[in-house]
Structure formats: structure tokens, C-alpha cells
Amino acid sequence: MTLQQYMMFIYKWNPNRETVIIDARTHKRVEWNDLPENMNRIVLHIYPNESTITLYLGDKMEVEHE
């Protein structure tokens, strides 16, 4: 899935939520403008009771174990 497809998916299902992008290796927030072109490893976290959507750059193992 491309970054644009992710953005469309997020907006379609959660138009009123803020999207937060976190680099799983550094645990720091990344802005949309600073994302690399090739986003082939994104883990999407949507929590029903929160007002934000979190995209983690990196695979699930990195997110869970760092």
C-alpha cells in the first residue's frame, strides 16, 4: 500500500481524527512532509477510543520490542 493509499484509507474511516506518525526506531514523531518516498513498512494502529491514529514506521517487531 502506498502512502497516498494509507492517507485515503485513514481519511475515509476516520475523518475527524488526527494522524500521528511515529518512527519505531527513534520513537519520535515524523511529519507528513518528512516521510521517505518508499513507505513499504508501516504498521497502522487505530484505537477506537482515542482521537488519534498512529502510523509506526518500521515493522511490528520493532514497535513491540523497543
PLM segments and residue spans:
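Detector for methionine-enriched segments
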Residues: 1, 7-8, 39, 61
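N-terminal acidic leader/helix
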Residues: 2-23
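Detector for the mature cores of small, proteolytically processed
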Residues: 17-66
